A protein has these predicted regions:
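AAA+ P-loop NTPase nucleotide-binding core of proteostasis motors
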Residues: 1-29, 33-42, 46-55, 59-286
Length: 286
């Protein structure tokens, strides 16, 4: 079953998908959904996704048909209210173009770079390809909160003043600048709890079309990384940042050490900036 990963930036969505592909020893391709457009428009078309997977499989069609495709930033192709669907070539149009590929179809790829195929078109069956979609879905927690607390007036008219994705995202961005340090942890916990309650209708209200949502039966919410988690990321993995910087300094005969409170301060700054693990390197460099 295809999987939808949703959660804050820097929480490990891409790394998890890459690790799964390595453990299974299957081809893996990452597609940035923000570059996709409907067929006939400037930009990457839907077939380019499978072309990347085929390239990673060294043009072995059978191997590519068992691979994993990671659709990054899938929330950015949500339909935007006020734009006609026929003109939304980078949003709803892309979602519609992906439907057949997600459920399983034959995709013809015009060969360009492989000497093995001698210019012949390649046909790939997507039935057994695992598609993992990922996105931050900023504002989705507010849509869930509104659904859980909605009130009705008259014959079922919603009293909520917010309208879908645009208003929810705007409110979420405003919160990023108004959250006080003392309530940062409480705010993170509340958002995590709301993401745990996400339903298909919330994703549809966000801007994803029902047919697209239905092709991702498994929805996995990712939570904000805590201070302790960020400290572990700094120090424990094989390619952790702290050992990297210590090795770099040792080349100049400098011994670099970090006190525990310094590591916690770095983690706290990353939490305040809401950049997750991705922002740790920038904090250390600066």
């Amino acid at each position: 079953s295809n999987i939808l990963l949703l959660g804050p930036t820097g929480s490990g969505k891409t790394l998890l998908a890459q690790t799964v592909a390595i453990c299974l020893d299957v081809p893996f391709a990452i597609c940035d959904c923000t570059t996709l457009t409907q067929a006939g428009y400037v930009g990457e078309d839907i077939e380019s996704i499978i072309a990347k997977l085929l390239q990673d499989a060294n043009y072995n069609v059978e191997k590519a048909q068992q691979g994993i495709v990671f659709l990054d930033e899938v929330d950015k192709i949500g339909a935007v209210p006020g734009i006609h669907q026929l003109r939304d070539v980078g949003g709803e149009g892309v979602q519609q173009g992906m439907l057949k590929m997600l459920e399983g179809t034959l995709v013809t790829i015009p060969e360009r770079n492989s000497r093995k195929m001698r210019g012949e078109p390649i046909v790939v069956d997507t039935t057994n390809i695992l598609f993992i979609a990922s996105g931050a879905f900023n504002g989705l927690d507010r849509i869930v909160n509104r659904r859980k607390n909605e009130k009705y007036l008259g014959f079922g008219a919603q009293s909520s003043e917010s309208q879908g994705r645009r208003a929810a995202t705007a409110a979420d961005v405003a919160d990023n600048y108004s959250t006080a340090d003392s309530s940062l942890l409480e705010d993170m916990i509340e958002k995590d709890q709301l993401l745990n309650a996400v339903e298909s209708r919330d994703l549809i209200e966000f801007g994803m079309i029902p047919e697209f949502v239905g092709r991702f039966p498994v929805v996995v919410p990712f939570h904000n990384l805590t201070e302790n988690m960020l400290v572990q990321i700094l120090t424990e993995p094989q390619n952790a940042l702290i050992p990297q910087f210590q090795k770099l300094f040792s080349m100049d005969n400098v011994e670099l050490t970090f006190e525990p409170k310094a590591l916690r301060r770095i983690a706290k700054v990353a939490m305040e900036r809401k950049t997750g693990a991705r922002g740790l390197r920038a904090i250390l460099v600066n």
